[in-house]
Amino acid sequence: MKNFYLLIIAVLLVSCSQQNKRKVNNENVFPDGSIIPNWFLDDEKINPTELGKFYAITDYGVTNDSTIVQTVAIQNTIDEAYRNGGGVIVIPKGIFLSGALFFKPNTHLHVVKGGVLKGSDNIEDYPFKPSRIEGQSIEYFSALVNAFGINGFTITGNGIIDGNGLNYWKAFWQRRKENPKCTNLEVSRPRLVFIWKCDNVQLQDIHLRNSGFWSSHYYQCNNVKILDLRITSPHKPIKAPSTDAIDIDVCSNVLIKGCYMAVNDDAIALKGGKGPWADKDASNGENTNIIIENCEFGFCHSALTSGSESIHNKNILMRNCKVTDAKRLLWLKMRPDTPQKYEYITVENITGQVHSFIYIKPWTQFFDLKGRKNVPLSYSDNITMRNIDLKCDIFYDMKITEYDKLTNFTFENINIEAKNSAYNKTIIEGLTFKNVNVNGELIE
């Protein structure tokens, strides 16, 4: 009888173990199978009244006049808050012109509904300082909103941060007309928001628009939440060049949720460094544990892009999103002058319309081996696209070289209407199709 009871207990323990295993398998996990921390499940908005005293800029020498640049007075407000232990810098209703602003520890930015923090269109209002741009740690023009080494920095409110980028765009296209091979840095342009070496950052509800260059750039940051932002720049009648919505650059633990992005470049770009020895440079690095969910993408060059200034991206999860006018859903830029590894990237539960479903090709713009004799290799591994219902022009937009290696791709539960439905299975080693229908035909 004793042995019988022991047998029953053993069976129950095995059963419980299997149930727990199934429970873990059904929980939210990153593409590599690791459990998503509860931090990602918390999308509670910050109440700015709990962040300290409010410092309305109009109480500290700033006038409600949209025609004059008031950088000094606004910066003085930030500095006053810092001297008093911190607080929230408030942009009230009205339009306030400014050059580069530098936030200090324990200071925050809040733009009320009807308030506009508008960037100056004079590049001299953006000081040249140590910075990070296009995968390089160099001196460059400051952004409109700058935060360096500020843990807990927040931007809140239902107002607008406007880059006032029109003259910068015109200057860029004029230069490109004069020299079609000009680089993106030949025309001096400021970013809208640059956040560097800041942890526990949260941006919520704000509208970022009309940036002169990248709309928001996060470099060497951990634990960043970007919630319910609207990020826009025009693609017609004039194109706003290089106005990426969100650039993630050597960051870990990033949640992008509930955002609308429509820009004349990539919506979300994963960066991290470029060049033949980029992986040896301590200022470069990987992006890990990035979740993009419940977002909508209007016009953009790609909804999600790895590269081109990127060396290692891992555990990237994009889900439950709608794309209405993206040129590409997923773009893996294989840069032949940079060692790259893109791994454990999952795109799932997507609806809408794009030009190219998946786009993988060498990115040769400004190619430079800088004297390196051998070409570094680029790898993409464990890429999954599933539960997707899309209309597109091109289903399988891929071309690789001998220096690119694609392995372990899975396409599952895909329903595609495509003008060009051709595909070449030999491009990828370890390619799996599960219930993939293109123009009503099952692909195996």
Model regions and ranges:
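Right-handed parallel beta-helix
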Residues: 113-114, 151-160, 199-210, 222-235, ...
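A generic structural signal for short, solvent-exposed coil/turn residues
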Residues: 8, 49, 81-83, 101, ...
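Mature catalytic domains of secreted/periplasmic carbohydrate-active enzymes
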Residues: 130-132, 361, 387
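Extracellular "leader-to-stem" segments immediately downstream of a signal peptide or signal-anchor
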Residues: 2-5, 12-90, 95-197, 202-204, ...
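Short charge-dense sequence patches
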Residues: 22-33, 106, 176-180, 209, ...
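Proline-rich low-complexity regions
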Residues: 37, 92, 378-379, 391-392
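Glycine-rich, flexible loop segments associated with nucleotide phosphate handling
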Residues: 51, 132-145, 182-191, 240-246, ...
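Glycine-rich beta-solenoid repeat tracts in large extracellular/virion proteins
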Residues: 100-103, 116, 120-121, 143-148, ...
